[in-house]
């Protein structure tokens, strides 16, 4: 599901709320989540999961075109850990 599909679905379910207001709310929520992660803070949504940053250590990579070795710096990457409720709901398809 893309962001626009999410907005469309939410707007369809909440017909009393203008679609533009739903779009603004979704964009604002995602912006706040991104800003919170950028500050190094963890986000926890009970029953859904948690977002945090994980550190990736420096390593030697490889240029796929030339095959040359490339030094890659360490960096922080976003990480999502699903909550128990979400894992249980997803397992009905597994």
UniProtKB/Swiss-Prot annotation:
Keyword Cytoplasm recorded: no
GO CC field: chromosome; cytosol
Residue ranges of coiled coil: none
Classification via Pfam families: Bac_DNA_binding
Signal peptide (residue range): none
Keywords annotated in UniProt: DNA recombination, DNA-binding, Transcription, Transcription regulation, Translation regulation
Presence of keyword Transcription: yes
Family annotation (SUPFAM superfamilies): IHF-like DNA-binding proteins
UniProt xrefs under HAMAP family: IHF_beta (MF_00381)
Function: This protein is one of the two subunits of integration host factor, a specific DNA-binding protein that functions in genetic recombination as well as in transcriptional and translational control.
Name this polypeptide is given: Integration host factor subunit beta
Organism: Serratia marcescens
Recorded name of the encoding gene: ihfB
């Amino acid at each position: 599901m893309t962001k626009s599909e999410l907005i469309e679905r939410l707007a369809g379910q909440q017909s009393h709320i203008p679609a533009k207001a739903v779009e603004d709310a979704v964009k604002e929520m995602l912006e706040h989540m991104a800003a919170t992660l950028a500050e190094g803070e963890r986000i926890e949504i009970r029953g859904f999961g948690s977002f945090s940053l994980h550190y990736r250590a420096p390593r030697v990579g490889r240029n796929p075109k030339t095959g040359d070795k490339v030094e890659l710096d360490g960096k922080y990457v976003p990480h999502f850990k699903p909550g128990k409720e979400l894992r249980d709901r997803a397992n009905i398809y597994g």
